[in-house]
């Protein structure tokens, strides 16, 4: 998008902390991008079918959309189908195989991925250390990989 254009945010329920925080982080970053305009924000979606149904209405009401940020890979997959051939860039989160394939195929433009393995490992490690009485930080920042068509193969090779 070259740091300019019109975008939509399509998110899961704002009552779920993960979706709310993802939206907040995205909106905070957008303050640095004065030439990118958030045209519409919709929330409450987290499946394929709802996104496809809603996308026709969104495209009719906002015909100049250049991109969509969504808070769930599942939603992004539905959007990728609904916007196929439109040139609309899709950005999302979640490390799941079908979304990674969509990045490889160019249906999803960018994917923020955290290793589910690492999340599980660090969670159990925290619990075990806590039970042993080992003092540890309450927060642990895990690595996030930003995947595009250009680097997704490298990411896949690291996971092997």
Language-model segments: residues:
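Hydrophobic residues at beta-strand termini and immediately following loops
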Residues: 41-42, 111-112, 142
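Hinge/cleft segment of the Venus flytrap/periplasmic-binding protein
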Residues: 10, 14, 18, 29-30, ...
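Hydrophobic alpha-helical segments within soluble ligand-binding/sensing domains
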Residues: 1-7, 21, 50-52, 96-99, ...
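Short, solvent-exposed amphipathic alpha-helices that sit
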Residues: 17-36, 54, 78, 119
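Short, glycine/charged-rich beta-strand-loop motifs at protein surfaces that mediate ligand recognition
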Residues: 88-89, 110-116
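Hydrophobic alpha-helical
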Residues: 26, 39, 44-102
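Structured segments of extracytoplasmic/periplasmic soluble domains
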Residues: 1-4, 29-33, 54-61, 82-85, ...
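Flexible loop/hinge segments that line or gate small-molecule binding clefts
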Residues: 6, 10-12, 94-109, 154-156
